[in-house]
């Protein structure tokens, strides 16, 4: 047996400068060792294949892969396997590396002594019995590619197609080579790192004295927690190294000075002890009443994210938006999700990332219908919930009439009136429901009053009493193209639904086909020579109704505007449409890729490629607010920093000049038109 090792991670990170080429390094080492072809010939074939595969992402990516091939062919080290390994008993073994005089200590896993035997896996544990049972009986066998062995009886409790939420928390995939480390002494407690995190793997916690005392010894705290009334609390930022995808967005978002950064990326193995801290905080730290409103970037991140550890790409913009929405409204949220990236990272069986609040047990109710009828599906959910709620509202009204006829105390009539007076105020109504139902439950338990049957009927419908937040999620392929007819119908209906469009300007999930959201000059499938016509103005179409709330957002350009638009849209009594700019792997962002996702949003706004605004029909005074300044950046420099545009210049230089100029002019006209519209909408 010949045993070789190679530090592909180090080569990719330090020598090539692109962590994604680890596989290319390993491939080259394999061909160098296998002798299937002469190594020079193999290198030639590999470079040719790399050029063909990666030219669409630009010359830099091709050059990086070529360098990885060259280095990988020579960077492996042979390890002489000691005969003593056959009967090894020690936890460490001395290993002689070929070409080196010294030896190194290598960990010998205990199960090597019984090679071939799979160690038993400890059963999943947790406070939610239904979820734990689901993970042990279904998630783990399926994850091990053993799903065919499951009997039909294993799905008996899921015959209606429902699955318990939150199974993704049990995966702990540990796929990131580098993860964040938090330096408490440098932290300014802004929570921007958590705000941009696509996978909810970095979270702020405010611990009281008891929680802090019980925390693992390796828990780090700032010297004090900033904020009025927080003097007795301790602030920590907990990180899950086994759930992190290593995207580095948190590091890029940190506003501290580079020489005193509060977060930096380090090797995963150095941070594994922080998993215990994260798990403790998630399971045991209560949500506090803090002086930071959830309408602020800082305050919103103390809310538990109800979308966590999804399978989306590292750096994904879509999950950053969706995670934030669940923090704000997740406990009373319904989601109808179009097929596409957001349905894949949002609902892939068996481990779904949407979860429930630890204290209330409530979370988003998620469903996926077809690609083309998602808007109609969401409207159906809204109308069904509306009908059920109105039925129980009437029962409360009838009971109130009966209470008044019986001359019951003001406390009893007050609890019903408190509910009826807050029907359109989601937060106040949720509190009123809890108060009313607790009183009704007490009366039902006594069982002596003639109103008990009516009270019992109301309690049976408790889940439908509070105001719900209905959301329709989907990408631009759905919203601009395949599902547009349904979306238009739903927006025109006037019903109180919220639509979130993740605009990647391409069919991301199916491999990069052009959509009506794709822009002039963009190269995609079905637009190999660059798209010649402009991007559909979905926002203007929706605004033309006059009664639809419409916003365009870009989280990396303005976190506060993103938060404000989402809050306003949900509070608006009527249909709302939010279009979020979402840089994607398909864009081929140069020099860093998706680790620059949030920065790319900022550049897009500065260059005038993307405009941020809010159109609120219910606003007093100006109804259209432009939140982005007049463009100051270089439009063509921005688009050519992305391979989806730069490869047009490589393939069709003259056509690219024509289309890029056309695209820049269209962007200027779009902003000028927006300014004129803002003037028209002033009272």
What is each of the regions a protein language model found here?
Residues 22-27, 344, 478-486, 509-510:
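Short glycine/serine/threonine-rich phosphate/pyrophosphate-binding segments
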Residues 4-6, 204, 265, 335-338, ...:
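General beta-strand structural signal in soluble alpha/beta enzymes
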Residues 61-63, 184, 314, 477-481, ...:
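Active-site glycine- and acidic-residue-rich loops that bind
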Residues 1-8, 210-229, 354-356, 507-520, ...:
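Flexible glycine/proline-rich, aromatic-decorated loop/lid segments
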Residues 2-53:
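Short alpha-helices
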Residues 55-244, 251-334, 338-469, 522, ...:
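Ferredoxin-type iron-sulfur electron-transfer modules and their immediate structural context
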Residues 452, 458, 466-472, 481-496, ...:
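Glycine-rich ThDP/TPP pyrophosphate-binding loop and its adjacent helix/strand module
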Residues 9-12, 48-50, 208, 243, ...:
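Acidic, glycine-rich active-site loops and adjacent beta-strand->loop/helix elements
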């Amino acid at each position: 047996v010949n045993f070789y090792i190679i530090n592909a991670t180090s080569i990719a990170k330090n020598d090539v400068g692109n962590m994604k080429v680890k596989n290319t390094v390993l491939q080259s080492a394999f061909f160098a060792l296998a002798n299937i072809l002469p190594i020079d010939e193999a290198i030639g074939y590999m470079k040719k294949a790399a050029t063909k595969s990666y030219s669409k992402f630009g010359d830099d990516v091709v050059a990086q892969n070529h360098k990885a091939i060259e280095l990988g062919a020579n960077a492996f080290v042979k390890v002489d396997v000691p005969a003593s390994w056959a009967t090894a008993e020690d936890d460490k073994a001395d290993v002689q590396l070929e070409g080196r005089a010294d030896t190194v200590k290598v960990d010998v896993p205990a199960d090597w002594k019984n090679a071939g035997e799979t160690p038993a896996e400890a059963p999943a544990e947790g406070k939610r019995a239904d979820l734990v049972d689901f993970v042990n009986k279904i998630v783990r066998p399926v994850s091990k590619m053993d799903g065919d062995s499951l009997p039909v009886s294993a799905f008996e409790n899921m015959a209606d197609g429902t699955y318990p939420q939150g199974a993704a928390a049990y995966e702990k995939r540990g796929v990131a080579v580098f993860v964040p480390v938090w330096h408490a002494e440098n932290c300014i407690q802004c929570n921007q790192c958590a705000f941009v995190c696509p996978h909810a793997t970095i979270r702020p916690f405010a611990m009281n004295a008891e929680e802090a005392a019980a925390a693992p010894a390796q828990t780090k705290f700032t010297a004090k927690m900033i904020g009025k009334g927080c003097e007795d609390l301790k602030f920590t930022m907990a990180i899950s190294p086994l759930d992190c995808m290593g995207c580095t967005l948190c590091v890029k978002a940190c506003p501290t000075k580079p020489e005193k950064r509060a977060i930096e990326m380090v090797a995963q193995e150095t941070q594994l002890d922080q998993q215990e801290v994260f798990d403790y905080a998630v399971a045991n730290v209560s949500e506090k009443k803090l002086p930071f409103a959830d309408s602020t970037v800082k305050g919103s991140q103390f809310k538990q994210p109800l979308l966590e550890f999804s399978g989306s790409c590292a750096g994904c913009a879509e999950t950053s938006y969706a995670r934030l929405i669940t923090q704000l409204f997740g406990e009373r949220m319904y989601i109808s999700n179009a097929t596409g990236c957001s349905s894949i990272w949002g609902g892939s069986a068996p481990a779904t990332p949407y979860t429930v609040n630890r204290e209330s047990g409530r979370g988003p109710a998620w469903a996926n219908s077809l690609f083309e009828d998602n808007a109609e599906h969401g409207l159906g959910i809204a109308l069904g919930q509306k009908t059920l709620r109105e039925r129980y509202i009437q029962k409360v009204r009838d009971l109130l009439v009966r209470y008044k006829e019986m001359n019951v105390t003001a406390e009893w009539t007050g609890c019903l009136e408190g509910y009826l007076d807050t029907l359109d105020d989601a937060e106040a109504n949720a509190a009123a429901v809890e108060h009313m139902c607790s009183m009704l439950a007490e009366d039902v338990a006594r069982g002596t009053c003639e109103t008990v049957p009516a009270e019992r009927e109301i309690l049976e419908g408790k889940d439908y009493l509070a105001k719900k937040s209905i959301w329709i999620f989907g990408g631009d392929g759905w919203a601009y193209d395949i599902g547009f007819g349904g979306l238009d119908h739903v927006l025109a209906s006037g019903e109180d639904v919220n639509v979130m469009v993740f605009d990647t300007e391409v069919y991301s999930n199916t491999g990069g086909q052009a959509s009506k959201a794709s822009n002039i000059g963009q190269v995609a499938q079905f637009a190999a020579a660059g798209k010649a016509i402009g991007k559909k103005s979905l926002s203007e179409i929706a605004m033309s109704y006059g009664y639809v709330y419409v916003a365009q957002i870009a989280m990396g350009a303005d976190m506060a505007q993103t938060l404000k638009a989402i809050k306003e849209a949900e509070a608006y009594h009527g249909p709302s449409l939010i279009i979020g700019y979402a840089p994607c792997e398909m864009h081929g962002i140069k020099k860093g890729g998706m680790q620059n996702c949030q920065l790319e949003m900022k550049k897009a706004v500065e260059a005038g490629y993307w405009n941020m605004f809010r159109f609120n029909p219910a606003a007093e005074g100006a109804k259209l607010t432009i939140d982005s300044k007049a463009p100051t950046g270089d439009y063509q420099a921005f688009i050519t920093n992305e391979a989806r545009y730069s490869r047009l210049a490589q393939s069709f230089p003259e056509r690219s000049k024509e289309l890029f100029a056309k695209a820049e002019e269209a962007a200027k006209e779009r902003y000028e038109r927006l300014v004129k519209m803002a003037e028209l909408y002033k009272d």
